[in-house]
Amino acid sequence: MSQLNSVWVFSDNPERYAELFGGAQQWGQQVYAIVQNTDQAQAVMPYGPKCIYVLEQNDALQRTENYAESIAALLKDKHPAMLLLAATKRGKALAARLSVQLNAALVNDATAVDIVDGHICAEHRMYGGLAFAQEKINSPLAIITLAPSVQEPCTSDTSHQCPTETVPYVAPRHEILCRERRAKAASSVDLSKAKRVVGVGRGLAAQDDLKMVHELAAVLNAEVGCSRPIAEGENWMERERYIGVSGVLLKSDLYLTLGISGQIQHMVGGNGAKVIVAINKDKNAPIFNYADYGLVGDIYKVVPALISQLSR
């Protein structure tokens, strides 16, 4: 695979920089970073950028989208081949603005990127995860938002040093102002990094029955996830535990499903697990088409038996 001359990275979520650098170093000969403050500049320095550009803040409550004009002015002068962003809500909003201002092709939620005969090709899901599309980008600049857990994080070298430059703030024509920020309760789980996950679906009859699910997860040293109806319909679990096309994409070694039917929208998130074990009382449930191991049975009988056996 050939490499591009330069790839630039930006993320509104600092935790995503390691993944972005992992991809950028694979696809570009030189990698440049754009960050929002000097603390982030120091954090990404060990990832090996050629130079770090620090965005000048106009306001402590600045919204990410407002940096579009500042970043566009910078990139017009530098002529990169690719701008790589984290596929967050803010990241995709910023990418859309940059795509218009720089007349650049944009691919959101990319699951794979390749350089073929000097052209950037990016793969992404479509039709709610029913299919994948591969886009061949012909514009001089490609803007790609990278889905989480697609790339392995890059290694860090604490001895690496590079210059930093400040990017002047260019106010957008219509500035979106944030008046106040309030911290929400932090989630205690990141399922995308979990090695083992127990997922629960509509086969669970009551919220109190989550106790046995958590008990099984504890025995397996696993995290607990769920299908969309449990998180957004019943509100039995936090949104961060929802596995699916618009939720978490698993990369776990094991995914044990309890009472999950296996609709495609859910399996887009669960199919990345190395081993899938399904327990469902409906022998015709679609989940068994994805499972490496399947058991037709009532989770209210199977789960207590598993806990008993695994606790010995």
What are these model-derived regions, one by one?
Residues 1-312:
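N-terminal glycine-rich FAD/FM-binding segment characteristic of electron-transfer flavoproteins
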